[in-house]
């Protein structure tokens, strides 16, 4: 089984190679990130992470100062550059979303040295995840079929057929529903596009070109607007709280979702037709255009 390795792992042994691969723009992103989230940076931060020389680190800091002169000031007593009150991030990689995602990766897989720009970090934890078995060779074959517009012969297991049976699929995309990986594919047995769990594909072999079916998934290519509101059964103060939680505009959130993925989204939001009968305090959100959405799910 291949090692679970990402760029940036085992940094102590790869500093020189990172420095060779990553140009100055990447190092400027690093400076921006560390100033935003650590509040400070010095030359050794750059030399340690990228394996570059001290003179090169000085040049990078000088270049960043030209780029955003109001973002940092030099503290002579500590010999570090500190972010100022006027700091405004230059790069999207310094966003709160990116930073929290970096922390989440550390919490989910603490045994892996994640290749992010994290310096000091708060203690962080995440609820354990159940990971499904994935066969590298199977996933590789599915990806090849997607790339080359080909069909694949597979053995697929399901709750109704736990031993597995032969099927021919023409996959066109991968899907993550928030919990599991699927491939979206034309099922030659059923004569329709369906989702197939990658963990339940036991074998996959090339079955030749099938470009026509690889591009004809109407439900995949159709985008549906979902309008979310604070649940009308909540009191005014509670609705205001929910609207602030989700940064609603005029009391609404507008999402676009592929029609083929609607059920997954509603399940995560606790808003399927079955789930929607719970107490308002449990649901918190509601579908403003629920009649339209539930009708689409029945198609």
Swiss-Prot record:
Changing residue 194 to A: Almost complete loss of induction by bacteriophage lambda, wild-type resistance to lambda, constitutive repressor. Residues 156-200 are annotated as: Probable ligand-binding region. Changing residue 200 to A: Loss of induction by bacteriophage lambda, wild-type resistance to lambda, constitutive repressor. Changing residue 245 to A: Almost complete loss of induction by bacteriophage lambda, increased resistance to lambda, constitutive repressor. Residues 208-299 are annotated as: WCX domain. One of its GO terms (molecular function) is DNA binding. Pfam families: WYL. Disruption phenotype: Required for CBASS function; cannot be deleted from a plasmid encoding the whole CBASS locus even in the absence of phage challenge. PROSITE patterns: WYL (PS52050). Residues 131-211 form the WYL domain. Induction: Represses its own expression. Induced within 30 minutes after lambda cI- infection, increases until 120 minutes post-infection. Residues 1-15 have a biased composition (Basic and acidic residues). One of its GO terms (biological process) is defense response to virus. Residues 96-207 are annotated as: WYL domain. Transcriptional regulator of a CBASS antivirus system. CBASS (cyclic oligonucleotide-based antiphage signaling system) provides immunity against bacteriophage. The CD-NTase protein synthesizes cyclic nucleotides in response to infection; these serve as specific second messenger signals. The signals activate a diverse range of effectors, leading to bacterial cell death and thus abortive phage infection. A type III CBASS system. Binds specifically to and represses expression from the CBASS promoter, found between the genes for divergently transcribed capW and cdnC (cognate DNA). Homodimer. This is DNA-binding transcriptional repressor CapW. It comes from Escherichia coli. The gene is capW.
